[in-house]
Amino acid sequence: MAAGLALARPNLLNPNNPIRSLSLAFWLWKAFVFLIIIGCPGPGYDTSTGLLPYQESAASGAKLEAIRHAPFSFPLKLVRWDSIYFVHIVRDDYVFEQEWAFGYGYTRILSFLTSVALSHIAHYFSVLALYRLSINIFGHDNTSGALISFLSATLHIICPAGAFLSAPYGESLFSFLNITGYFLYSSSLLDANAGKRASSDAKLLLAAALFSIATAVRSNGILSGALFAFDALLQLRKIFTQGISGDILLRLGVIVVGGCVIALGLIVPQWIAYTTFCMSDEPLRPWCEQLIPSIYGWVQVHYWNVGFLRYWTLSNLPLFILAFPMLFLMCRSSIWALNTAWPLDTATAVLTRLAAPNGLLAVMAFTSYHVQIINRISSGYPLWYWYIICQLSSHVADSSSVVKRSQTFSIAIQGMVIYAIVQAVLFGSFLPPA
C-alpha cells in the first residue's frame, strides 16, 4: 500500500514525520486560502460587513455613503454571512431573537478569544485529533493503518468547508470538539477491552463533555449522542442475556450520565433564552407557550425557513446539485462502515457506531436543512475521510494490499482543491452559496 500511495502524494507530505508534515501542510494551505480571500476585489452584493466598524455613527446619509465605498480591512474580509451575526453577538450580546439560531457556546468562547485565531487553532488541533483518532481505529503498527491515519488528516486540511474553517464560524471549533470526542470515545473502548474500567469510564464521560460543548456550538452535535444510545442498548442486551451484574450496571450508569451530559449542551442555551424572553414583564413570544418552548426551533422556522422539506423548491435545485457529492459520500460511507469487516475489534466497533451520526446528518441535511451547508458541517465527521482513503485498495484491512484506483483518488483531491479555491473567491466577495 505504501508504494502505491507514494505515487499519489506530494513530496511535502511525509508519513514518517506526520506531525511536522501535517503542520506544514496546514499552515501553507491556510496562507493560500487567506491570500485568496483578501485578494478578492470587492464586497459583492452585500455590504453588511462594512456596517460593523461604524454602526454607532452611521445615522447620516453621508456616513452610510462612506461605508458603502470604504475599503474593508483584511480581518473584515473574513466576516461574511453568519459570521456577521457572530461578531455582533460577541460585541453586543444576544440582542435580537433570531440571533439565538447561532451557537451559544461558540459566541461565549469568542468573547475570550479572537475569532479568526480561534478558527485556525481549532482547525489545526482537529487535524491532529483526527490523526490520533485514526491511529486508535486502524492501528499504527502496520503501514496501511499509518497511511490511512495520515492521509485522512490531510484530507481534513483541504476539506470542502474551506474558507469557513478560517472565518468566524463555528465549524472549526465544532470539528475539533466532535473529533476529539470521538478520539476519547475510541480510547474508552480500547481501555474497556484492556480491562481498564476506571480509565474507560472516565474517558467516556470526558467524551460526553466534549460532545455537549460541541452541541452548544452547533446543534447537530447532539447526533453524537447516538453512540451512547447504542452502548446503552448493548448493556441492556447483556442484562437480558447474561443477567444483572455490578459491572454491567456501573457501565450502564456511566453511559446514561454521559447521555444526559450531552443533552445539556442543547438544554442549557434553551433555558437561558427561556428565562430571558419568557420570564420577563414583556409580552410573551409565541414559542414561549409551545409544549416544548425552544427558541432555537422557533427562530429556525420563523426567520430562516428551516424545516422538513421547506427547502425543496425548484429554485434551490442548484444547491441540491452542489450538495449531492457530499451527501453521497456521507451516505455511502455510513453503509461502508456497517458492511466492512475489519481485523481489529476496535475498528469494527467504532466504525459501526459512527455510521449513525454520519448517516443521520446526511438525511437531515437532505430533508430539513439549507442543504448546501452539508459541505461545511461535514468537516467534523471523519467517516467519509476514511471511506475515500480506503477506496484506494481493494482490501484495505490487509496491510499488504496494493493500492488501486489512485487516479480516482487524485481526481477527488483535485476536485476538493478546486472547490475550495472557487469557494474562497465567492466567500471573499460575499457571494453565494454560503
Swiss-Prot record:
Keywords: Endoplasmic reticulum, Glycosyltransferase, GPI-anchor biosynthesis, Membrane, Transferase, Transmembrane, Transmembrane helix
GO cellular component terms, semicolon-separated: endoplasmic reticulum membrane; mannosyltransferase complex
Transferase in keyword set: yes
Pathway the protein takes part in: Glycolipid biosynthesis; glycosylphosphatidylinositol-anchor biosynthesis
Membrane topology term: Multi-pass membrane protein
Subcellular location per the Swiss-Prot or TrEMBL entry: Endoplasmic reticulum membrane
Pfam entry (one): Mannosyl_trans2
Protein name: GPI mannosyltransferase 2
Native species: Aspergillus oryzae (strain ATCC 42149 / RIB 40)
